[in-house]
Amino acid sequence: MIEFQAPTPADKAWVDELLALGNLRGCDYNFTNLFVWQKAYRFELARMGNFLLIRLRGRTGNSYMYPAGSGDIAAAIRALEADATERGEPLRLVCLTPPQMAELEEFFPGRFTCTADRDGYDYLYDIDRLADLGGKKLHAKRNHIHRFVENNPTWAYEEITPASLPECLEMDQEWYRRSLQREGEVEERDLGDEGIALRAAMEHYEELGLEGGLIRVYGEVVAFTIGDRLSADTYDVHFEKAYGELQGAYAMINREFARWVREHHPEIKYLNREDDMGVPGLRKAKESYYPDLLVEKHTAILQKA
């Protein structure tokens, strides 16, 4: 069997090196996501030459991601097949993009059946469109921001620092409490997968090389966002929170962070705002910004010979 290990911050350097060889725009191929979401999906990593191998044990069963890196991809997939066989499992590959599916079919013709995972598609946006909000399609977003500025004249955007992380965590807990109250429920924030992931990101913020921004109104944090580089031209927005009762707060933190990324990373062309998980409200919100690209995701299962 392949010796997979759970990721730790110490793995970031070698994992990033291999991910850079793949230069993939899907948020699944990002060390931060592999680390902070490991309790939810039980990610495990291994290295095979210049390939990163990823195994996960999520709600849909035991799976592998398509190898990321460079070299003999067919050999890497055969190694995954052997590992799955030793574990008594079918080889299931998840988060495959269309180019990866085409490559899989080239080397293993007719051996895999593939199904689309629409709920997992990533939404990519041209960074200039999110930073400038030009054009008729985004007129409503400009109106939301105008209303936010009118109603909150003391608003200020600033970069997240280690000193302000506790305030962001406190704001997230309050955001969650308000959300649950609207739904008639009360429970602790850290019981949810996202709460665990966010706490891990904040606890290892500097080790993971994360960046972020926040908005204050009368000195209080009312919105924040956290992200990092995903590929040569794409930046991943991992977390974004704003008080929903403040009209335009989400639109404002979205715009301000896009402007910050554009200024500090001029090579970035797209912002990946990740998937909608099949949640109708999230899908509507992400579609309302009219994505420039969708990173399609598929699952491929090896059929018995």
Feature locations, PLM:
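Intrinsically disordered, low-complexity, positively charged segments
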Residues: 10-38
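Conserved donor-binding loop and adjoining core beta-sheet/short helix segment
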Residues: 27-99, 216-244
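Short, glycine/charge-rich beta-strand/loop segments that flank catalytic centers
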Residues: 90-107, 119-121
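Short catalytic-loop micro-motif centered on adjacent basic/acidic residues
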Residues: 92, 158, 269-273
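Conserved active-site alpha-helix within GNAT-family acetyltransferase domains
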Residues: 100-114, 143, 277-294
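Acyltransferase donor/substrate-recognition loop-hinge adjacent to the catalytic core
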Residues: 109-189
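A mid-sequence, solvent-exposed acidic-amphipathic segment
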Residues: 162, 170-232
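Aromatic (often tryptophan-rich) hydrophobic motifs at membrane interfaces
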Residues: 210-303
